[in-house]
């Protein structure tokens, strides 16, 4: 039974899973949208929402937490500069997951996750 198992495992050890989510979050914020598998998209969605909420806060502590999570320092600065004007009136729901066709090789469910 999966009682209180809230973290999607994604078939990886903890360190690889964290690195994967950090990388996906960095790429999503950089490019605005990425195409990945549906479970990965759902997992990275909460991480990106957390980073945008930190950027809306705008404090020095929030900036340092984002710098510790995302891989690109310049990307953090641009996120903090534009987050307030882009997402100022929104209370969450900064990303959207759209289902797309299944992957040809292994028939995995694919999804496009994008920033709103």
Swiss-Prot record:
GO BP field: translation
The organism's place on the tree of life at top rank: Bacteria
Residues passing through the membrane, by range: none
One GO CC term on file: cytosolic large ribosomal subunit
InterPro entries assigned to the protein according to its UniProt record, in alphabetical order: Ribosomal_bL17 (IPR000456), Ribosomal_bL17_CS (IPR047859), Ribosomal_bL17_sf (IPR036373)
Keywords from the UniProt entry: Ribonucleoprotein, Ribosomal protein
One Gene Ontology term of the molecular function aspect: structural constituent of ribosome
Subunit structure: Part of the 50S ribosomal subunit. Contacts protein L32.
PANTHER family, alphabetized: LARGE RIBOSOMAL SUBUNIT PROTEIN BL17M (PTHR14413:SF16), RIBOSOMAL PROTEIN L17 (PTHR14413)
Family indicated by similarity: Belongs to the bacterial ribosomal protein bL17 family.
Name of the protein: Large ribosomal subunit protein bL17
Organism: Trichodesmium erythraeum (strain IMS101)
